[in-house]
Structure formats: structure tokens, C-alpha cells
Curated annotation (Swiss-Prot):
HAMAP family: HSV_TRX2. The keyword Membrane does not apply. Interacts with TRX1 and major capisd protein/MCP. It is found in: Virion; Host nucleus. Structural component of the T=16 icosahedral capsid. The capsid is composed of pentamers and hexamers of major capsid protein/MCP, which are linked together by heterotrimers called triplexes. These triplexes are formed by a single molecule of triplex protein 1/TRX1 and two copies of triplex protein 2/TRX2. Additionally, TRX1 is required for efficient transport of TRX2 to the nucleus, which is the site of capsid assembly. This is Triplex capsid protein 2.
Length: 293
């Protein structure tokens, strides 16, 4: 196994060692892969000490190297870097119970912990949240929606709907999402979303109506009929059946642009799956997982 050794700058107390032992099997991100690191390279404290913005922390987390805490030996931690396809015991550091087959992602620690994990002078151990990928995506969608709704309105106008968006229930657990800070980073995400939406809205209807009409000749499904009804209400820049052989390249370019814009939106909301749950302990504190990437 590819072991990484983390040495603490000061001598740990027995209480500190006991706390770390309880975190065995936790996923801990580090900035880069080195065999010897100090405790300041461990976890997300360095990131959170410079920014509290969810989007920015999420982007930095994506670039970090994942390790798994294997053992505590005195003043030293032994971590391993997981390998694709291998199976590991993983500590559930998220708010939700896990089930077999869950795909798991990592998100910034947006929930206020009931207690701090380990606090030393000028440093604190802060871990990401291990969350099912579909829920992680829903969280990102809601955060983006909150940003878009609040960018041109006073908070009082959207307070009720934002409170609803911030409250998320999953598997009988209810969590509260953080407030969104509309700074340069989140504004960039909103610009990306708006540009993508506008290009899809401009290009998609013209090309889609042609395909819907052709498909409806073969399949009279209710979904296709509804699509036709929706498209019939729109005004098109040209007749949908007027594409000529010489315009195939233009049509193809529109299709590719629409798919590119869809991918742009996905990049704002989709999360990478790191683990797939193969089994879960009775108390749901540990999960046997296969490392995906």
C-alpha cells in the first residue's frame, strides 16, 4: 500500500490520540501526494482559514488528494492513498445513513459540527462530508438556485423560498444548507449558468422541433406529443423542415453547442463519485466501499 506518514508539530495528549483513533478509516484530503507531511497539510483547515465560500471550497476539494486514516502511532498518523477498484473500510463522516449500492461523493463541511474533532494551537482537523452522490448533486443545484434567485432581489423578497431550498430531508434526516455568499466565485458560476441557459434556449428549439416531428411519425408517445405542443407555442427563426444538405454543418454545430452548454451546467452541479458502498455496518458508522477514482 502507498503509505503516507503525518507527524504533528507538538506532542499529542492521550485525549488527542483517543480522538484520532476514533477517526480511523476517515477520508482525509491533503493538498498533494507526499510520503511525509505535517498536520497542517491534513484536512481542510488551511482552505477554510482563507475562505468560507462553499463554491470555492468545493473547487479546491476537487483538486486535493484523498487519503484514508489507517492507524495512529503515538505522535504520528499512518494514511494510505486508495487505489481504483480496491475495497476499503470507510468511516461515515456525513449526516445521512448509507445503504448498499450508494455512490458517494465528498462535499465541503457546510454543517456546523456538534463538537470539534481535534483542536491544536493554530490548527484544527476539519474533514469533508461523505454524502450519496445524488444528494450531493441536489445540494449543488439548490445552492445555485439560491444564488440566482437572490442576485437581483432583496433578501426579504425571497426569504421564504430560500428557507425552503436550504432545508433538505433525506432518509429521515433533515439538514440546513449554508447561506450563499454572492462573491466573485459564485458570480462566475451564475454567469456560466446564464450563458449556457441562453444558448440552449436560442439554439435548441429550432433543431429539436425537426427531430420531434420525425420521431413522432414512428412513435406517438404522450411525451413526444407534449413536446410538440410546447414547441408549437414558440416562434422559430426558420421553418423546422427547411434544413438543406448544405446546412448540415450548421445544424451539427448547433447540436454540439447545445451539448457543450449542457455539460457546462452539469459541471456546476454534478459531483464525482469516489466510492461505491458494498456493505454497511449495523450502526451505520462504517461502510465497506470500492474506490472508484
Amino acid at each position: 500500500m502507498d503509505s503516507i506518514y503525518c507527524t504533528f508539530d507538538q506532542k499529542l495528549t492521550l485525549s488527542d490520540i483517543g480522538t484520532l483513533c476514533k477517526l480511523t478509516n476517515a477520508v482525509i484530503p491533503i493538498p498533494s501526494h507526499r510520503h511525509l507531511i505535517g498536520n497542517t497539510n491534513l484536512g481542510l483547515y488551511t482552505v477554510l482559514s482563507t475562505t468560507t465560500d462553499y463554491i470555492q471550497i468545493r473547487d479546491i476539494l476537487k483538486t486535493m488528494v484523498l487519503t484514508i486514516l489507517q492507524k495512529v502511532e503515538g505522535n504520528q498518523l499512518i494514511l494510505i492513498r486508495p487505489k481504483i477498484g480496491h475495497q476499503y473500510e470507510i468511516k461515515n463522516t456525513g449526516p445521512f445513513p448509507l445503504e448498499k449500492g450508494d455512490q458517494l461523493s465528498l462535499l465541503p463541511p457546510f454543517l456546523k459540527p456538534s463538537q470539534q474533532l481535534l483542536v491544536l494551537p493554530n490548527w484544527e482537523l476539519i474533514l469533508p462530508l461523505l454524502i450519496p452522490t445524488d444528494v450531493a448533486t441536489e445540494i449543488n443545484v439548490r445552492m445555485l438556485c439560491i444564488s440566482l434567485l437572490s442576485i437581483h432581489r432583496k433578501y426579504e423578497e425571497v426569504q421564504i423560498i430560500i428557507d425552503e431550498l436550504r432545508t433538505l430531508q433525506y432518509r429521515d434526516v433533515t439538514i440546513k444548507l449554508p447561506d450563499v455568499i454572492n462573491d466573485c466565485k459564485s458570480t462566475f458560476s451564475m454567469k456560466t449558468a446564464c450563458i449556457s441557459f441562453s444558448m440552449i434556449a436560442t439554439m435548441a428549439p429550432d433543431i429539436v422541433q425537426t427531430y420531434i416531428e420525425r420521431l413522432s411519425l414512428e412513435d406517438q408517445s404522450m411525451l413526444l406529443i407534449k413536446c410538440q405542443e410546447l414547441l408549437a407555442k414558440k416562434n422559430f427563426s426558420q421553418e423546422p423542415s427547411s434544413f438543406k444538405a448544405t446546412e448540415i454543418k450548421t445544424e451539427l454545430q448547433k447540436i454540439k453547442t447545445v451539448f457543450t452548454m449542457i455539460n457546462q451546467i452539469n459541471s456546476l452541479t454534478q459531483e464525482k463519485t469516489f466510492f461505491i458502498v458494498a456493505d454497511v455496518s449495523a450502526d451505520n458508522r462504517l461502510a465497506t466501499c470500492i474506490f472508484k477514482e
